[in-house]
Structure formats: C-alpha cells, structure tokens
Amino acid sequence: MKLQINLCALALLLMISFTAMAQSKTKAKAKAKKEVAIQLYSVRDILNKVDNKDGKCDAAYITLLKNLAKMGYTSVEAANYNNGKFYDRTPDQFKKDVESAGLKVLSSHCTRGLSKEELASGDFSSSLQWWDQCIADHKAAGMSYIVAPWMDVPKTLKELDTYCAYLQ
C-alpha cells in the first residue's frame, strides 16, 4: 500500500511538472513575434502614385501601410526624405500615419552629396546645416537610424579628402 501511495504521488508530481512545462512553452510561443522591417523603397512604385500634397493624406498611402502590417511587417524604413518631409508628410504626420497602421518607424535612408562648389572650396557648411535639419526631422518622425545608401564617386584626391572631412 505504501508503495502504491508513493507511486501515485510520483505520478502526480510528474503530471504537474509536464503540465507546467507545456504551459510555459505555449506562453513563450504566444509571446514570440519576430520584428521584421520593410524598406519602403521596395514599394516605391506604389508610393510614387500617391498624392499627399497640400497636407492631405491619400487613402492609397494609408491602405499600403495597413497592408504591410497585415503581411507581418512590424517596422518601416523610409526612403523619401525631401524638403523636410517624408512622402510629402511632415515628420509628425508620417509617424502618426505609420503608427496608425500598426507599424513602427525604425529608420530612413537618405544622403546629401557635396556640390561642385563645395568640393572645389572645401566649404561644406551648408550641407552640414542640411544634415542638422535632416537629423531633427528624423528624430521628430521617431527614427532611430539614418542610413546613407550611396556616395558620389570623387574624381580627384582633393575631392576624396573633402568627402572624408565631410563624413567625419
């Protein structure tokens, strides 16, 4: 009888342990969601057709963002920073648009090459001012990163030296 009680107690402990393990695995699976961002440059053909000018917000633009979220994307990288705006939306508007679609703003890729005058003179202060505004706008849009996707190829060693100083 004592053996039977011990075996029953052992079986009960094993059942409780396995049940707890199964529940913790189920909770872990439910919590696990991959973070996957999409570079909006990859859907530029669609975005180039939207009309967000004059402060209005094109329905096709919002639909695209919502569809990206439905596909499983969790964040976006912008690729259209121009005159202080992203896709003709102010940084605050862009952030609200993206977040209302269920996505996060992660990053942007943009750059500013040096003009011929800047390369010749070595004075790139106007480009640095542009970057100051660019960084402020990206922060306002909620971005954590800015990627420079390309750089003009310098034609001379002097131009290369100027670019090196500029990029520092």
Regions found by a protein language model. Name each.
Residues 168:
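Histidine/acidic residue-rich metal-binding segments in metalloenzymes
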